[in-house]
């Protein structure tokens, strides 16, 4: 009898533990994350339960707590790639791309052939604007796989971040030759063409892409902008209206649609879109300029005067600002030892 009681007492904690585990599993299956966190003891040392707790915290957007749990697991086992990736994702979701990159790099060092880890590492570097390190990482990728269109695409982004437009274009061009249907690559190439005022080239490359897909927002933005800059306002209006139908109500889409309507002599359409762009960025002088001119040609003529006056107030520095700028200029000349120029500006 004594042995039976002892055996029963030994089995009791095991039974309770199994019940708790079943409860946690059921709560996870039912997306009841609060219950999951509640059922797992604060001082729990079980790695599987802690991973489950971190997943529940992450699902509730409680990222700092999830990060704390995952870091405690990394201290126990720094080679667990699943925990490293979960930790990287939590850092990304808190906007800390640099720390996310560090986690992806550790996972990548553990599994050098894993393309996902390498891809996420480079993306995180680009997101954190560590362009030089991203460039180096891309070259490392391309040493392993010289045919990778994605590798060249991200190399182009790294060069863009480094303000090296020529190398960026060369990288995008190689990526495009390997995969001409990658929307991001097409949009980036078209963006460089537009920035260089090669608007016809931007139209050509985007129209080729549009033969297979007319719904990509990034490609259509560059396509529409090129038509607007070429003063083909009718086509630009169609493209920008299509973008709005796709849900794009960004500042630049509204601004360029307004400008295109203005160029196409539909001033009410120009007014409506420029007014919406103005509400998003009331300090933009270009928006105020076209909004004023559109207003003057519609029923809102007094508004037109007010908008143009506002543009003047923003564009022309006040007297006090000019005095401050001149004082600063004189000070800089003095420090540079250029007394003659300093006296001229006093």
What label would you give each PLM region?
Residues 344-346:
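Conserved small/polar residues in nucleotide/adenosyl-binding loops
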Residues 52, 86, 120-123, 154, ...:
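Canonical tetratricopeptide repeat
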Residues 16-71, 75-82, 93, 102:
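N-terminal leader/linker segments that initiate helical-solenoid repeat arrays
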Residues 29, 59, 93-94, 127-128, ...:
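Register position in tetratricopeptide repeats
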Residues 48, 82, 116, 150, ...:
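Start-of-helix register in tetratricopeptide repeats
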């Amino acid at each position: 009898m004594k042995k039976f009681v002892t055996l029963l007492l030994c089995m009791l904690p095991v039974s309770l533990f199994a019940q708790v585990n079943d409860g946690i599993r059921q709560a996870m299956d039912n997306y009841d994350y609060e219950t999951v966190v509640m059922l797992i003891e604060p001082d729990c040392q079980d790695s599987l339960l802690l991973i489950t707790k971190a997943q529940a915290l992450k699902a509730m957007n409680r990222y700092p707590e999830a990060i704390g749990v995952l870091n405690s697991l990394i201290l126990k086992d720094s080679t667990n790639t699943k925990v490293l990736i979960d930790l990287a994702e939590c850092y990304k979701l808190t906007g800390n791309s640099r720390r996310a990159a560090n986690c992806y790099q550790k996972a990548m060092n553990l599994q050098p052939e894993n393309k996902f880890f390498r891809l996420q590492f480079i993306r995180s570097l680009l997101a954190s604007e560590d362009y030089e390190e991203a460039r180096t990482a891309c070259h490392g990728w391309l040493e392993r796989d010289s045919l990778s269109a994605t590798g060249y695409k991200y190399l182009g982004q790294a060069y863009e971040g480094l303000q090296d437009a020529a190398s960026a274009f060369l990288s995008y061009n190689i990526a495009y030759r390997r995969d001409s249907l990658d929307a991001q690559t097409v949009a980036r190439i078209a963006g460089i063409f537009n920035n260089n005022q090669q608007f016809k080239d931007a139209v050509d490359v985007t129209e080729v892409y549009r033969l297979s897909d007319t719904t990509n927002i990034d490609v259509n933005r560059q396509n529409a902008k090129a038509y607007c800059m070429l003063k083909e306002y009718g086509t630009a209006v169609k493209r920008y209206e299509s973008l709005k139908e796709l849900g794009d109500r960004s500042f630049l889409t509204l601004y360029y649609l307004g400008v295109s309507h203005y160029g196409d002599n539909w001033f009410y359409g120009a007014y409506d879109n420029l007014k919406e762009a103005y509400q998003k960025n009331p300090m933009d002088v270009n928006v105020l300029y076209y909004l004023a001119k559109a207003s003057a040609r519609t029923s809102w003529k007094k508004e037109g005067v007010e908008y143009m006056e506002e543009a003047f107030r923003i564009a022309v520095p006040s007297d006090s600002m000019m005095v401050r700028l001149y004082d600063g200029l004189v000070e800089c000349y003095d420090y540079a030892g250029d007394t003659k120029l300093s006296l001229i500006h006093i």
